[in-house]
Regions:
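Short amphipathic alpha-helical interaction segments
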Residues: 528-542
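Residue-level "edge-of-site" marker
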Residues: 28, 203, 536, 553-554
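Class II aminoacyl-tRNA synthetase catalytic cores and aaRS-like
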Residues: 1-499
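Short amphipathic alpha-helical interface segments
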Residues: 497-526, 535
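Short, cationic-aromatic polyanion-contact patches
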Residues: 498-501, 550-560
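A short, conserved structural fragment
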Residues: 541-551
Length: 560
């Protein structure tokens, strides 16, 4: 426990001794939010707000503070004689001045006014402690010139402690507000067409509907293995068989695979299935939907993403899988067998292995040489049958399927088919997947005989699509990492880090960013006394977190 944490716990006990409950149970009747008070300012109006103290400037019998609520921040003014009308001034002198800290949450009753410099402010008539915080916020430091240091910007810390990220970085909350708006826009778009939102199982006896490595668990009562779903496709198609002609689900799916800036093992996808439609119809619906989302969120169809300008105005370009590969590699692979595909992969230095069949080899070529080329929305259409075990055979070419994927900024955003509804063909495709599994492909699909049985009762011609919502949200909010659009992305386990003081952490964090440097120059960047500095460096050396050495001219310090 740090010195600051000890002091806050002592203050907590002092509050209790004074009869103040630092964690009251009863509701606090908020009727105002910061941004509304600023945008609709009314002189001398009564207000009731609540929020977190983010800064304080105590000036004797008066004090300015900044309160942050869910909408923003507003300045508040504490005056001892306004708060303490009788001779007992302890509420201001003791509770406010000595026992409250930055980070504490309080409720305020007051009136609106403007300061001499015109800043909209709440004059505090009374306040109530709603939560005493026991850890200090890692607030940035600002020098006399207004330069900010030690901001809460380390990605590891931000993702691991999202609650602090939301408190300290207001723009982060904006991303997640937009995320909700995007999902609501999609839901409203589909509901207006009278499509039915449904729910299907997350725990499944067979992980079907996609080629991916699943997470496996065990049901103790039934003594059977179960899988976290990799897709809800097969269950949704069973609903189409049952006569629900247009169904969709916002589903949480799980794939036991790698993590990078575009992949998280737990992710959100929209899956939609509509009877009596085909993949051409689904392309039209998809571009209408995504254009609608862009306009609702940004007011226009063109947006800046990273350094690129992307136009979501429909219609979108279309190019076949084989034509795209020929365009960017020079190879016509449309009639190549598995051995020929493996050879050209080697010729182009594309990493492959013996478990990869024809479909995965083609996918490797496209992924390595083509997909990053598509910046504006582009439909890649007409995939080989070997890549698409759940897709209907192409109406004019039996070697292809009626499938498209939507690529934007080099990322796959959507995957759609004219759905395979021939049960005999579907079983043969599943059996081919089984053979790939025997060769070592751990992403090959399982055979789902109940799904085959449902198709044998008859599924109408159907088109289906899955849209990766996390990636779509990345694009719409100009974020280049999927972790930025997930409240709590999956993180690597923490190492057992040694316990050190907050000041030692500040020194270590700064040193880790700088690397090896001159000891005395580095020391001059802090305001610590010589005694304090010696104590901190000793603390870090004992924990083997830094090392200090000497060359011919200088004393050097570096992180271990």
């Amino acid at each position: 426990m740090t010195e600051q944490e000890k002091i806050r716990r002592e203050k907590l006990e002092e509050l209790k001794k004074l009869g103040v409950n630092p964690y009251p149970a009863e509701l606090f009747p908020i009727n105002n939010f910061s941004i509304d008070l600023i945008e609709d300012y009314k002189e001398n109006s009564k207000v009731t707000i609540a929020g977190r103290i983010m800064s304080r400037r105590i000036q004797g019998n008066a004090s300015f503070a900044e309160i942050q609520d869910s909408k923003g921040r507003i300045q508040v003014y504490f005056n001892r004689d306004e708060i303490c009308k009788d001779n007992d001034k302890s509420k201001y002198n003791i509770i406010y001045k000595k026992l409250l800290d930055i980070g504490d949450i309080i409720g305020i009753n007051g009136r609106m006014f403007k300061t001499k410099v015109g800043e909209i402010t709440v004059l505090v008539k009374d306040f109530k402690i709603l939560n005493k915080s026991l850890r200090p916020l890692p607030l940035p430091k600002v020098d006399s010139d207004g330069n900010e240091y030690d901001s809460f910007s380390d990605l590891e810390q931000r993702y691991r402690h999202r609650y602090l990220d939301l408190i300290l970085n207001s723009q982060v909350k904006d991303i997640f507000v937009k995320r909700t708006k995007i999902i609501n826009t999609i839901r409203n778009f589909l509901n207006k067409k009278s499509y039915l939102e449904v729910e299907t199982p997350i725990l499944q006896p067979i992980p079907g509907g996609a080629s991916a490595r699943p997470f496996i668990t065990h049901h103790n009562a039934l003594d059977i293995p179960l899988y976290l779903r990799i897709s809800d496709e097969l269950f949704l198609k069973k609903l189409i068989v049952g006569g629900l002609e247009a169904v969709y689900e916002f589903s949480r799916d799980f794939r036991n695979e790698g993590m990078d800036k575009n992949h998280n093992p737990e992710f959100t996808i929209l899956e939609l299935y509509v009877a009596y439609k085909d993949y051409f119809w689904m392309m039209d619906l998809t571009e209408s939907l995504i254009e609608k989302v862009c306009i609702e969120l940004n007011g226009k169809t063109k947006i800046q993403y990273d350094s690129k300008l992307i136009d979501f105005k429909a219609p979108y370009e279309k190019i076949s899988m084989f034509d795209a590969i020929k365009k960017f590699t020079g190879y016509d692979i449309s009639r190549m067998d598995e051995n020929e595909l493996r050879k050209i992969c080697n010729d182009m230095s594309i990493e492959v292995d013996e478990s990869m069949g024809e479909g995965k080899l083609i996918d490797a070529i496209f992924g390595s040489k083509c997909e990053k080329k598509f910046i504006n929305p582009t439909f890649i259409i007409d995939y080989p049958k070997s890549m698409s075990p759940l897709t209907k055979q192409h109406r004019s070419n039996p070697n292809l399927t009626e499938r498209f994927e939507l690529f934007i900024n080099g990322m796959e955003i959507a995957n759609a088919y004219s759905e395979l509804n021939d049960p005999i063909d579907q079983l043969e495709r599943f059996e081919n997947q089984l053979e790939l599994g025997k060769k070592g492909d751990d992403e090959a699909m399982f055979i789902d005989m109940d799904f085959i049985k449902s198709l044998e009762y008859g599924m109408p011609p159907t088109s289906g699509i899955g849209i990766g919502l996390d990636r779509l949200i990345m694009l719409m909010t100009n974020q280049t990492s999927i972790q930025e659009v997930l409240f709590f992305p999956q993180m690597k386990p923490l190492r057992n880090e040694p316990v050190i003081s907050n000041d030692a952490k500040i020194v270590l964090n700064k040193l880790q960013k700088k690397g090896e440097c001159d000891f005395n120059i580095f020391k001059s960047e802090f305001d610590f006394s010589n005694k304090k500095w010696d104590k901190l460096t000793k603390e870090l050396r004992v924990k083997d977190l830094i090392s200090i050495s000497k060359n011919e001219n200088n004393l050097l310090i570096k992180p271990s």
